[in-house]
A protein has these predicted regions:
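C-terminal active-site subregion of NodB/CE4 polysaccharide deacetylases
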Residues: 268-272, 279-304
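Extended substrate/RNA-proximal surfaces in nucleic-acid metabolism proteins
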Residues: 14, 21, 77-235, 290, ...
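An N-terminally biased module of ancient metal coordination in phosphate/nucleic-acid-related enzymes
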Residues: 1-98, 185-186, 198, 202-282, ...
Length: 310
């Protein structure tokens, strides 16, 4: 995965908002949190990179859930456009009763512990989605095949609730993903199956063992994602090797950003920014929150993989 392979990707105009011609990027920041069709995004990795270049980002990170499957396509597109790419993953975990999504950047993807971790997470994800789909299918016109059909990258797609949501939309049950998440597949729904995940300390140590940098995604999303980590819990994760907190994210209210800035300052953690872009899968706009080059250089310094121009 270290070597970028050439691709025959050709740009096109589609629902990812990409035009047929390229655009010079003037470098207004780095979006360190974006998803492709290899998890729950709607655009291919190549389209993700091309859009980042066209809107003027300095660079972009591909951070699909629990997989590196989209890295090669993204890297090929980045090389073709001479555009800086950060290869990463958003890893599902928990710490106590808090759901913790860990942004892992620029680690060795061939590390045995990382590979085993992703294999286990994929297995747990598939089991959960099948259980939820079977429960929903008793009352609504969707089945496993309909959900699988919504996984745009086939067997390499990391399965998740968004794919059930897409199947419900395709069946005319829901108008969009947001409606599905607010109702049929919400945690309060009788069809909901809780996610299984590894402990956050275990995940952080695995990424650090693979020589990557580690951040906590949407670390102050108290309104939309349930309980958030306390200062004491963040300190424990910092002791395990945590490098950063994603402070600038649309789900973090201002009071949480203020709290997290103070914690990051005390613990000497990096403050990162990301859009959590999913193409048409969310309203989030790529680049709406962007990290500066100094922060990215520090991430690269701590990591196994390199980034062009850094």
């Amino acid at each position: 995965m270290n070597d970028i392979q050439k691709s025959d990707f050709s740009s096109k105009s589609d629902n990812c908002g990409i035009s047929k011609t390229g655009a010079e990027h003037d470098g207004f920041g780095w979006d360190l949190h974006c998803h492709s069709s290899f998890s729950d995004g709607t655009c291919s990795p190549a389209e993700l990179v091309e859009k980042a270049a066209q809107i003027g980002l300095s660079g972009v990170a591909i951070t699909d859930h629990d997989t590196t499957a989209g890295w090669q396509q993204a890297a090929a597109a980045a090389q073709k456009l001479n555009f800086p790419l950060i290869r990463g993953t958003e890893i599902t975990s928990h710490f106590g009763r808090v759901s913790v999504h860990i942004l892992a950047w620029l680690y060795d993807p061939q590390n045995e512990a990382i590979c085993a971790l992703f294999d286990n997470l994929t297995k747990m994800r598939k089991e959960r989605i099948l259980l939820m789909t079977d429960k929903i299918s008793k009352d609504y016109p969707i089945d496993r095949e309909a959900v699988f059909a919504c996984m745009k990258s086939g067997d390499e797609t990391t399965p998740g609730r968004p794919h059930i949501a897409d199947a419900l939309v395709a069946a005319g049950v829901c108008e969009n993903r947001s409606q599905a998440f607010a109702g049929i597949i919400s945690p309060k729904s009788p069809y909901y199956v809780p996610a299984s995940s590894p402990d956050a300390v275990q995940v952080i140590k695995a990424v650090k063992n693979a020589c990557g940098a580690v951040g906590i995604a949407h670390s102050g999303a108290i309104c939309s994602r349930g309980p958030v980590l306390s200062e004491e819990q963040i300190e424990e994760l910092a002791d395990a090797g945590l490098d950063a907190l994603e402070i600038f994210h649309r789900d973090n209210p201002e009071e949480q950003r203020i709290r997290l800035k103070k914690i990051a300052g005390r613990l000497n953690l990096l403050a990162t920014a990301g859009s959590d872009w999913h193409g048409k899968g969310k309203i989030n706009r790529m680049g709406e929150n962007a990290s500066d080059s100094e922060t990215v250089r520090e991430i690269v310094k701590r990591s196994f993989l390199t980034v062009a121009g850094m």
